[in-house]
Amino acid sequence: MYVNKQTFNSHPEKTNTEKEMQSYLFLEKIGVDYIRAEHDEAATIELCEEVEKVIDAKICKNLLLCNRQQTKFYMLLIPGDMLFKTKYLSAQINSSRLSFASGEQMEKLLNVSPGSLTVLSLMFDKEENIELLIEKNVFKDEYFACHPCVNSATVKFLTSDLKDKVLPALNRKYTVVDLECPDDEV
């Protein structure tokens, strides 16, 4: 996979999609300093490993989940190397068993395709249909990294800016969850 070894600290003159440019301009408007990396499409966390070396930060795994009736939707942010077991999450948020939302639902609700889901896509959730869940270990790293609504670029910024600038600007409250597996299940 191609990853440009040069990083940038501002938006490019031109992007392939409007939503990518909106992501950069949103971060700049709210005073978030970021590092931007360009690369081939990285739709899985495994493909992001090369990008992580260039930006020197772990990329967050973003999952769009829904209840069985598909009436409640959740965006879950977890460390990229963490396994996700739905039973631990369902119990913590008092929900029936959760499943992955479809790509079609992702497009409709957040204007992104599978592999491009990001906390920044919440800017397209004007009706606030998505409940944000953040695994506690996401806050342990100094930096937070995610795609800018397309999976051919990645941005890295301070995790404190996620909490103190990004989420308030998105008008988002969130629930912290603990998804570490008990030792007997590892």
Please report, for each region that a protein language model flagged, where it lies by residue.
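Extended, low-hydrophobicity, polar/charged segments
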Residues: M1-V186
